């Protein structure tokens, strides 16, 4: 079953998947026009899908040039259930709040704080505003 919405509010399944211990495949556009996709930790904050990266990383530089982003969050317990969010990064947050946020995500995924020696540049929270969300659940029976 597939369900699509163009609403800027998070679909309940998107929020559920982003709040859980599920990984996101995140796609941004390189300056050459090619796509770059990587796996990231994901969360929900202020009604938005949020990611956390560092300012020296290619992904962040891509988003500075072009804020469009696709975030696909797969249910770790059921790979045939996922949410795709196409949207834009509409807010970024740096400083102590971003540093604490990466610790929150790290505790969610690993059980401990993010290692300080792994940080090479300033942390930044990326808030994604959806323009289109597609929810896929291939196990859901749509016949009544």
Predicted features and spans:
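Hydrophobic alpha-helical segments typical of transmembrane helices
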Residues: 9-13, 59, 101
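Charged, gly/pro-rich active-site loop segments
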Residues: 2-8, 81-144
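Short beta-strand segments
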Residues: 21-55, 69-73, 82-85
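Short, solvent-exposed aromatic-acidic interface loops
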Residues: 54-58, 109
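Short, basic/aromatic recognition patches
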Residues: 2-24
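Short, surface-exposed beta-strand-loop junctions and turns on beta-sheet-rich folds
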Residues: 57-59, 78, 142-143
């Amino acid at each position: 079953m597939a369900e699509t919405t163009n609403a800027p509010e998070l679909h309940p399944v998107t929020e559920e998947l982003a709040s859980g211990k599920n990984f996101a495949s995140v796609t941004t556009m390189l300056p050459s026009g090619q796509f770059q996709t990587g796996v990231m930790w994901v969360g929900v904050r202020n009604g938005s899908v949020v990611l956390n990266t560092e300012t020296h990383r290619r992904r962040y530089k891509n988003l500075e040039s072009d804020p469009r982003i696709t975030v696909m969050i797969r249910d770790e317990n059921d790979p045939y259930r996922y949410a795709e969010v196409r949207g834009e990064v509409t807010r970024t947050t740096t400083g102590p709040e971003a540093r604490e946020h990466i610790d929150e995500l790290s505790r969610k995924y690993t059980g401990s704080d993010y290692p300080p020696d792994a940080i090479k540049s300033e942390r930044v929270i990326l808030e994604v505003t959806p323009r289109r969300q597609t929810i896929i659940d291939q196990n859901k029976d749509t016949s009544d």
